[in-house]
């Protein structure tokens, strides 16, 4: 039940927010190969929200379900207690590009998960929402070199996100 409350409250607000998404000029990548996208991603940075407060070692794991939807397992270690937390969700692609997903931690509420930038070798990804309230930089590695991180910070700025709002994730 603690897991539900840790990740739950703000995920609900994410879903309510994205249900009323306004028109946006935010562009996603042209195409995502879901098979290559699956697996473990480590969070490098994010916009702060209560469902991830006090979290370190944040990662997301994506796997394909039998029904062709995506199983999402987000996890972290609480900094203050060193307690492991996780939250499970289901995602599906809204079109053939696979760059716009809908994710639900609490059905029937689904939130936007847009892939805004993706390395050709699937080593890093920028994920955001059309409302620009949510933003994540993820990597296949726990640590990202400064040169690449600076490149991605320039990219998020060009997309209209405020890089000063980013929280950098502790990865051990």
What are these regions, as identified by a protein language model?
Residues 1-5:
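Positively charged n-region of N-terminal signal peptides that target proteins for export
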Residues 6-7, 29:
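Low-complexity, intrinsically disordered short peptide segments enriched in small/polar/basic residues
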Residues 19-172:
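A beta-rich soluble binding module of mature secreted/lumenal proteins
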């Amino acid at each position: 039940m603690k897991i539900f409350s840790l990740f739950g409250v703000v995920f609900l607000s994410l879903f309510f927010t994205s249900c009323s998404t306004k028109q946006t000029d935010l562009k996603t990548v042209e195409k995502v190969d879901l098979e290559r996208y699956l697996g473990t991603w480590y969070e490098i940075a994010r916009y702060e929200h209560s469902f991830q407060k006090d979290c370190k070692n944040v990662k997301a794991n994506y796997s394909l379900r039998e029904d062709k939807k995506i199983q999402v397992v987000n996890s972290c270690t609480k900094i203050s207690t060193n307690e492991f937390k996780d939250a499970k969700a289901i995602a599906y692609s809204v079109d053939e590009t696979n760059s716009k997903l809908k994710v639900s931690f609490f059905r029937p509420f689904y939130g936007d998960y847009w892939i805004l930038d993706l390395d050709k070798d699937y080593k890093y990804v920028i994920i955001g929402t059309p409302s620009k309230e949510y933003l994540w930089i993820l990597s296949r590695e726990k640590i990202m070199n400064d040169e690449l991180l600076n490149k991605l910070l320039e990219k998020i700025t060009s997309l209209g996100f405020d890089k000063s709002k980013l929280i950098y994730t502790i990865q051990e």
